[in-house]
Amino acid sequence: METMLKSNPQMQQRNNHSGQETSLWSSGFGMKMEAITPFLGKYRPFMGRCCQTCTPKSWESLFHRSIMDLGFCNVILVKEENTRFRGWLVRRLCYFLWSLEQHIPTSSDASQMIMENTGVQNILLGKVPGAAGEGQAPDLVKKEVQRILGHIQTTPRPFLLRLFSWALLWFLNRLFLNVQLHKGQMKMVHKAAQEGSPLVFLSTHKSLLDGFLLPFVLFSQGLGVLRVALDSRTCSPALRALLRKLGGLFLPPEANLSLDSSEGILARAVVRATVEQLLTSGQPLLIFLEEAPGYPGPRLSALGQAWLGLVVQAVQAGIVPDATLVPVATAYDLVPDAPCNMTHDLAPLGLWTGALAIFRRLCNCWGCNRRVCVRVHLAQPFSLQEYTINARSCWGSRQTLEHLLQPIVLGECSVVPDTEKEQEWTPPTSLLLALKEEDQLLVRRLSRHVLSASVASSAVMSTAIMATLLLLKHQKGVVLSQLLGEFSWLTEETLLRGFDVGFSGQLRCLAQHTLSLLRAHVVLLRVHQGDLVVVPRPGPGLTHLARLSMELLPTFLSEAVGACAVRGLLAGRVPPEGPWELQGIELLSQNELYRQILLLLHLLPQDLLLPQPCQSSYCYCQEVLDRLIQCGLLVAEETPGSRPACDTGRQHLSAKLLWKPSGDFTDSESDDFEEPGGRCFRLSQQSRCPDFFLFLCRLLSPILKAFAQAATFLHLGQLPDSEVGYSEKLLQFLQACAQEEGIFECADPNLAISAIWTFKDLGVLQQIPSPTGPQLHLSPTFASRDNQDKLEQFIRQFICS
């Protein structure tokens, strides 16, 4: 391949490939391809079942196997049949007529009900110590309450809602090819709504457009007008005023004041009363659990946790008997408003800037067939009350990363402590801190649990599969016919793991659609015999492909963790460049594998892994090991003197039983019995295993290489510095390394921030107050070059070159 790309004819084609490339994109490659059946015949996995450990009753009651066969609908496909009228004119005005026929429930006087709320009344009467109403005239306090309430919400305007839904439907049809929604998932939500509990949709946040798309999708399916909790940082004051009239909710700035602030107490009381009024009136609520796109930082949204805490508080106080939580996820081929530069915070979106962005987008889409596909996923609803009761029994002791991993990194200890990792990067808001400590912990773990369910239910789009193949297997280029075969293989591997894909159709059409969406990051070159070569563009193009490939990581996450753990176990025994047969000779004991998997689990951020809080690390280790065996990478090896795997005779109980708070419901009972030395495994010698093993290891390479380069960056002595300044310097260092080594997938601001926060948790960096603000310092433990080298060596053992 390298020789073919470096030949003189190909270099000449590359120099003047602009016109030829345009013809290649428009001609459909000029090749005859076979059809693809990406759903393994009639089988299509149904994703999004709720947790059977935390919500067993919801798991049984809101699901029936018949809903799996209901198929999909295109939400934005509105025709004459979707209206009550027929005729030539109706076919041209069907969008407008459809918006007029949508049912918008009449809203009661919410402001009056909020003013009559017990918490607000106590402040008005001066019964709350330290609140703004103490010692003030009730009329003045009432005006302040109305001002705060006006900042939070206004009564939705039916005319504006109909006009906006018509305009949005027209815009979405020109922006997207389709917006697919599973009818069975929608049937589950309708069934949950009939039980009488208010619906609270908890969603991922891939795009700023989610705040418009999701309410429109649910509104079109007969769920009424959603109240959407939005971030005031992303909107200008004029846009916030418009969005309030369309159902938007915004936290007042006073709500984030200190707990003893009188203005903060009043604002938080009004916000609580607003949420209680929404829940009692049965209006559905949409909360985003992820931070807005374009803001480097923690994955879990502090604002989302604040709104979710208000819902939990209302249920705990008995304001409503229960609330039904619905995890939601949106998957795009390409995110429409993905920021090009993620190193700086985005400016708030205004009315004129938003209108200009829409106009530019429409101009780009005019006469263009590069529109993206969208999938909206609604996971199985579950009861908040049931989760609250069952989840508390899953809580156990936790320790910081410094106590768990630092002694092992420095070689002071070899035993991994038998406890879970405590890692929380999302800063708490005053609304969350106002709750009891036990409820704060409940909200944090519930948000992580729901976000994990949302990500697990999200389908894998064709761009993620194509980007993964180009980034991890073919950075130097690949023949199109080979790429299509591997595309089909990776699609089937995704489906076999119980994850859905967001595409269907012929392989030729899928390839043309996907590569046309990625044309800014790949190059097509024609070679002899009519075939084509697909070459990723170096530089920022690889960084973009790395971001797309992260969408595929949850599908193979367990195997990727296991493969990197095996790589770390073999690092001290076999040279990394050694042949696969030599690595397959080594015996890997079960205890050694467990230890390496645990070390890697502790090192990787929870924002990346998204483990369910009800699952212990040891259960996850067993799951990783089972996955490696199922995919054929590991084969059991019976050592001399060990019990055969088929021996089911009575065994002695182990002297130490590791009872985990989550309960281990695995089918295997081997954890309760002694096995001398444990089971042993070898790497499989099948011909496909070396490439698949390398593929799995490279899935985690971007973050592991970024961590290793961050450890190297410690040698340069750039501390002390502020966290923002140090993250910018680290990003510049990653970009410089990318230019030298060609590892552009590591030059990502989110990876730089993750490395800094992980090093803070590990005790490598310390944050010390100073007159100019908090400053990052190198801890005394890692001030020596030897300990810095140990840290880098510990990280690099998991990286497969």
UniProtKB/Swiss-Prot annotation:
Lipid bilayer topology: Multi-pass membrane protein
Positions in the Cytoplasmic compartment: 1-305, 473-795
Catalytic activity: sn-glycerol 3-phosphate + an acyl-CoA = a 1-acyl-sn-glycero-3-phosphate + CoA; a 1-acyl-sn-glycero-3-phosphate + an acyl-CoA = a 1,2-diacyl-sn-glycero-3-phosphate + CoA; 1-(9Z-octadecenoyl)-sn-glycero-3-phosphate + (9Z)-octadecenoyl-CoA = 1,2-di-(9Z-octadecenoyl)-sn-glycero-3-phosphate + CoA; 1-(9Z-octadecenoyl)-sn-glycero-3-phosphate + (5Z,8Z,11Z,14Z)-eicosatetraenoyl-CoA = 1-(9Z)-octadecenoyl-2-(5Z,8Z,11Z,14Z)-eicosatetraenoyl-sn-glycero-3-phosphate + CoA
Residue segments, region Disordered: 1-24
Annotated localization: Mitochondrion outer membrane
InterPro entries xrefs: GPAT/DHAPAT (IPR022284), GPAT/DHAPAT_C (IPR045520), GPAT/DHAPAT_LPLAT (IPR041728), Plipid/glycerol_acylTrfase (IPR002123)
A GO term for molecular function: 1-acylglycerol-3-phosphate O-acyltransferase activity
Disulfide bond sites: none
One GO CC term on file: mitochondrial outer membrane
GO terms of biological process kind: CDP-diacylglycerol biosynthetic process; glycerol-3-phosphate metabolic process; glycerophospholipid metabolic process; phosphatidic acid biosynthetic process; piRNA processing; triglyceride biosynthetic process
Residue interval(s) of motif HXXXXD motif: 205-210
Domain remark from Swiss-Prot or TrEMBL: The HXXXXD motif is essential for acyltransferase activity and may constitute the binding site for the phosphate moiety of the glycerol-3-phosphate.
Family per record: Belongs to the GPAT/DAPAT family.
Protein name (record): Glycerol-3-phosphate acyltransferase 2, mitochondrial
Taxonomic source organism: Rattus norvegicus (Rat)
Encoding gene (name): Gpat2
